[in-house]
């Protein structure tokens, strides 16, 4: 059996309206790349990146969901096993911000109770086209007791910081396992397919 190259696996989810830049945020973090020609995500896709936090190698499995309503049934089935969820809106699109309340309700309905949440106001490099003041993002984050960052995938503002902060918040809540424990507990999301068991 191949030796595990990581200590912990965290499943993260990106949600928000179509066109807010979720895929760009993910690619900036996973590949340090920005592409202006992405087509809308169909259904769901994911990337993996391993980071080191507090001396532990943590594999981040980051799922990028489609924002369109027609994919709602597919994407909400992925909420259940998520340990961290990033809600993304576009600071140049007021409707995408208004819909954050809908996305928060989706989390309440479909995700685990103890899931870590974070709000991202994306495209902050386009300040001249801003329609959502930063204070509004801060206010909704305060009301829901979640962290908030304004980000730009294009010029790489706060992308890595947001992902690492979310991972650190999850790590803080993760029980420490015995170092000699070889078994992967699939009921706690310990393996790549482990989180699926929570859908049952």
From Swiss-Prot:
Binding-site list for GTP: 18-24, 35-36, 40-41, 67, 122-123, 125-126, 152-154
A single Gene Ontology CC term: lysosome
PROSITE patterns: RAB
Major localization class: membrane
EC number: 3.6.5.2
Keywords: Acetylation, Cell projection, Cytoplasmic vesicle, Endoplasmic reticulum, Endosome, Golgi apparatus, GTP-binding, Hydrolase, Isopeptide bond, Lipoprotein, Lysosome, Magnesium, Membrane, Metal-binding, Nucleotide-binding, Phosphoprotein, Prenylation, Protein transport, Transport, Ubl conjugation
Taxonomic superkingdom: Eukaryota
Subunit structure: Interacts with MYO5A; mediates the transport to the plasma membrane of SLC2A4/GLUT4 storage vesicles. Interacts with GDI1 and with GDI2; negatively regulates RAB10 association with membranes and activation. Interacts (GDP-bound form) with LLGL1; the interaction is direct and promotes RAB10 association with membranes and activation through competition with the Rab inhibitor GDI1. Interacts with EXOC4; probably associates with the exocyst.
Stated name of the protein: Ras-related protein Rab-10
Species the sequence originates in: Canis lupus familiaris (Dog)
Gene name, Swiss-Prot/TrEMBL: RAB10
């Amino acid at each position: 059996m191949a030796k595990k190259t990581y200590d912990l696996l965290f499943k993260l989810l990106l949600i928000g309206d179509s066109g807010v830049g979720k895929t760009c945020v993910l690619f900036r973090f996973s590949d340090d790349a920005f592409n202006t020609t992405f087509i809308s995500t169909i259904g769901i896709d994911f990337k993996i990146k391993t980071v080191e936090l507090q001396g532990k190698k943590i594999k981040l499995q980051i799922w990028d969901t489609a924002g369109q309503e027609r994919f709602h049934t597919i994407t909400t089935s992925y909420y259940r096993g998520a340990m961290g969820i990033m809600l993304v809106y576009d600071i140049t699109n007021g409707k995408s911000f208004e819909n954050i309340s809908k996305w928060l309700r989706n989390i309440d309905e479909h995700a685990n109770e103890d899931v870590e949440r974070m709000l991202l106001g994306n495209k902050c490099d386009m300040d001249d086209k801003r329609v959502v003041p930063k204070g509004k993002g801060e206010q909704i984050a305060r009301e829901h007791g979640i962290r908030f960052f304004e980000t730009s995938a294009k010029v790489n503002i706060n992308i890595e910081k947001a992902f690492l902060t979310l991972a650190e918040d999850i790590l803080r809540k993760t029980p420490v396992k015995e170092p000699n424990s070889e078994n992967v507990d699939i009921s706690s999301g310990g393996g790549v397919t482990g989180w699926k068991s929570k859908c049952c």
